[in-house]
């Protein structure tokens, strides 16, 4: 058997085989060629024959840089094995999802990019020739699920086929191997190294030697084989495990291959097809048309046949279309008559009566009510409804009367005394007759009244059922007695008696039947409703509540039609499907079920008839929430091919929407215009116009477009609806009461990123705290119309963000406050009580004036309390200091002091005063000074705000300004800062922020001078006759450096620290 070397496949582009620099690799010492094992990725190994005599260049190391080599033409006279069509067909497609030893696709020359990048040794990444039998070398059908991954590989296949088909020299010529497309034989490492097929160039001795040396491969070192194959240890073990007959000879390829096979195997589009067989595309048109394209193959020259079918004709026999055709809607046309509507309702009622379902009788009653309303032009009278209710109740039920069970006079459980026959009277000794006549009963009642025994007379009358005498006599007595007689009378009636329901309702109570009707032991619910509707007197609200209670009870029992009948009698308005608490949405359909079962065609038609009956008495009395269901009904008409009727519905809905004016919903308006735009060509008036006027729309559609444009323009011009939409997008609802209440005084201007979240000013953030002691309530109209810098500057989040204190940036005001929050923080620092500073007390003041935080600051947590936990004596000293200091100020400061007094009154009234700690519960465990100040800082009363890098320059500047005039009542601001933070001067951003809050009242107006003069120096407090406003807990932390604006600390050391 002749030995065949395995056929080589083209290597990956850009990774050509380089000559080897190792003289011992692939050769024997005697100069003869020895096979070098190569590894296939499924474990099959093959031998590459190399000849150092015929190789133009030595083979390069695998790790050397790969360079593109020029292709060498085959020598004249060399015979090359023809490439079958299977090579071209399956070379670019993965035809197996999972590996199978011996059946792997061995012709796969170009791997995916990921596979090419996995192996760095391109010269060793080749597959061996497949060991397939002759009957297996048949082109398989292409799998539609396995497509090529790289476009270049697909392009390579196409170019290769083109060369095979159009080569004038056949398949074995030299020109075929010198073409632009890569040849599997030429691009293989064997051809690049000058190696040819055995039997052509190698003598028989070499072939025999090679065959003799084959068993020696098994004795080769595993490490050498791994290094030569480029596989890792685990990959090599796997390849050895799944190796399938590496020494088996390859049978010769089929010589009967022809280019025709290549045409058959390669026929197919370059891109994946959506369908693999001819199919039928179908589309629905807006005019009730069905567009049908017959199956055809355009590649075979077959023309596609397009057919147009009418949906009205196709669905002519369907029940849904028949139900829609039988209804003469919309009911606002001039050609609609009441007789047609009444006939339609009577037919529906008759159909309901024939059915034996649970609610068939109630459904027929609802249709009969619509007939009555249509006959009476929408007006309802209680007696007419009662007559309708009692039509099916011809045989009145015999309600069993209850015997009296208790003596109502002494309220005991004794039965009524019954005189037996033949028993002598103990007083007179006479034997009374067995049955007393009515005359005798009345005579005895009169005799008791002769002697003034009223209660005995009432008892006798009630015992003998003289309820008229008893009720009249009790009505002339006290109210308790009358109520007692009434209760005795009603107790003799059956609980399910309609008289019981009427008497309970007349007594001012909701009857018991309202909560118990619908049950089997209570009987029919109709007589109870009839007696209520026919005898409406007194409080109409009580009667309405009783009827609604009956409807709710029936709805709870599943009697939807009966419940809706009661709701119509109580004049309950129609609601919405999404609001489950609404009683009524569509007549005869419960909105607690899914929408497809809820919005039935019959329910929509029934509700439209009720709307029509209302418009008979009151024109244009549309049901606003029902218009969307009419639009749904119009869409169903268009789907079933009834396009003209659907367009009439669009016109009717448009008339209802135009009558509502601005209250119409914009979404309904947009969807109505869309549907009308599709159906407008079915209007005969549009079709009858001239060809140049075909684009003109109906007048009602043009009016709808104008109304939509006005609504959109109004929404853009009005900022309040825009804010409501933004707040809804930011996670809140448009019914946000807080946002609506303060929308008039916010004065926002939308920034580019404004729609991402809802931002509020610091003043509004204070209002969001859950504490009952709300500090500084916002007064409506206190802001200018355009808003200040606090409103137009950096936005503040609606949610809470932990504060971050950056070291080396000054006080925490500069770190945490934005443009508009600087002045607000200064006012809080000026008017807060002891211990309410924003930074830790353990701070030092360097000589350069910059405050350095000595230890890391913990984020300030938001607290509902609005006061600090300082001592009572410290608070009193603060107030005394403020009063003494204010008396020694100049007249210019007198007005400022008046503002401060107003602010204090406002502060006390708002729960943020000096003694507000008195109304709160102090903490049991005293915390350190740093923790106390961190938890009681003014920022903790507000929602914490995140700091930004540019906010540090907008706060208080600690550099004093010598030319600034002093201001009074600012010692409270400098007291809690260790003496160093009391020099308040605002930067350029602070001046703008001060202008933004110029209209504030109360404590906000106190710092107006401070806000308007950003370079002001806070003066030291007056030391004569006044107590320094310092917290004694700060004495150990006071720095040694002195300053002109710092007060004398000697007086502060005189007072020991007060417990909290």
Swiss-Prot record:
It is found in: Endoplasmic reticulum membrane; Golgi apparatus membrane. Residues 34-224 are annotated as: Required for endoplasmic reticulum localization. Residues 991-1001 have a biased composition (Gly residues). Its main location: endoplasmic reticulum. Residues 41-50, 875-890, 899-908 have a biased composition (Basic and acidic residues). Ubiquitous. Keywords: Endoplasmic reticulum, ER-Golgi transport, Golgi apparatus, Membrane, Peroxisome biogenesis, Phosphoprotein, Protein transport, Transport. The modification Phosphothreonine is found at residue 858. Pfam families: Sec16 (PF12932), TPR_Sec16 (PF12931). GO terms for biological process: endoplasmic reticulum organization; endoplasmic reticulum to Golgi vesicle-mediated transport; Golgi organization; peroxisome fission; peroxisome organization; positive regulation of gene expression; positive regulation of protein exit from endoplasmic reticulum; protein localization to endoplasmic reticulum exit site. Residues 1-86, 163-236, 245-264, 711-733, 770-796, 834-1060 are annotated as: Disordered. It is a peripheral membrane protein. It comes from the Eukaryota. The modification Phosphoserine is found at residues 55, 143, 167, 188, 191, 254, 258, 868, 871, 874, 882-883. Residues 51-60, 165-195, 213-222, 837-847, 1031-1046 have a biased composition (Polar residues). Plays a role in the organization of the endoplasmic reticulum exit sites (ERES), also known as transitional endoplasmic reticulum (tER). Required for secretory cargo traffic from the endoplasmic reticulum to the Golgi apparatus. Involved in peroxisome biogenesis. Regulates the transport of peroxisomal biogenesis factors PEX3 and PEX16 from the ER to peroxisomes. This is Protein transport protein Sec16B. The lineage of its organism: Eukaryota, Metazoa, Chordata, Craniata, Vertebrata.
